């Protein structure tokens, strides 16, 4: 990776490696613009879209596969450009697009699993789990070339993953219109699959691969693609993949989470190479922390897994951002992340914003309209919030 010079706040000139690459996969609900209900029309929409848009398990969902980028301005530009194409194309069919963990209006009898052999086999094998998979998530990929490091870092970042989930929380309502009391009901639905949750305690790529082979041998999953751990080495690219997050109505939320995850990966690789012990997350505590993040979002307490205790979400998020300041400054992301984190805490999670929309007129239609509007809005952050890179950077 190329080194480039940067000027820190102290005035000292330092050298920083080119930031690790980032890529995003976003899942989007399709809704009928007349009824605001989920619409199983992805098979009609996808042929109208360019490459990079694909089907998902449910035919009311479309996924985008983003470009590989190195800077946050590039990332945001890619996210918003792909959203604009999807939103504009869907509108020609009378469809709205929603980036959120769940949408509060649907007719269960109208929902359809996508007609591919893989998805139909999943329906046959998992039944209710597949039928109720009316949820959308965001997957964030960060480049790691070494497979062994990828496996080890997946475990080392575990203590901070619940905080990233809380930042993304965008599913307070279930598809029957009920307020679940959670900020991310998607998490509860998702965790029913047999291979979700914390990354397994593997110490090498070979050990991780052996575990996946054993899971396939049990017949519980059919292939490695069904290893749905919260953080996992990606299957087809040299990246580490964060899978815990809800889909996010605001692209800026994804930019924030991606920047924090990239900084976490960098911090833990530095620690691994320096022999710094990893923070050990005991599975029951890790699961409790994920549950609490799904319950509270940014509006209640979160579990601090470093010193196990319940603490206000704002304090946990602020501490994470401050902890990662050296890595964020090295990648020239500090100013952007500090501003986006401040705004996230001031304005609340998407779940809280949806509940505010609901309280205005007690209307779920208003909630869906709010989500459609936020998803389509590509100008929510002033230009100076994502400063232009002064130094060019190589993709690594």
Swiss-Prot record:
The alphabetized UniProt keywords are: ATP-binding, Ligase, Nucleotide-binding
Q: Which reaction does it catalyse?
A: L-cysteine + L-glutamate + ATP = gamma-L-glutamyl-L-cysteine + ADP + phosphate + H(+)
Q: Which cysteines are joined by disulfide bonds?
A: none
Q: Which Pfam families match?
A: GCS2 (PF04107)
The region annotated as signal peptide is none
Q: Does the keyword Nucleotide-binding apply?
A: yes
**Which GO MF terms are attached to this record?**
ATP binding; glutamate-cysteine ligase activity
The cross-references to InterPro entries, in alphabetical order and at most eight, read: GCL_type2/YbdK_subfam, GCS2, Gln_synth/guanido_kin_cat_dom, YbdK
* Domain of life from the UniProt record: Bacteria
Please state the Enzyme Commission number of this protein.
6.3.2.2
What is one Gene Ontology biological process annotated in the Swiss-Prot or TrEMBL record?
Answer: modified amino acid biosynthetic process
Q: What class of enzyme is it?
A: ligase
Matching entries from NCBIfam families are given as: gshA_cyan_rel, PRK13517.1-1
Q: What does this protein do?
A: ATP-dependent carboxylate-amine ligase which exhibits weak glutamate--cysteine ligase activity.
Which family does the UniProt entry place this protein in? Answer: Belongs to the glutamate--cysteine ligase type 2 family. YbdK subfamily.
Protein name per the record: Putative glutamate--cysteine ligase 2-2
To which species is this protein native? Mycolicibacterium smegmatis (strain ATCC 700084 / mc(2)155)
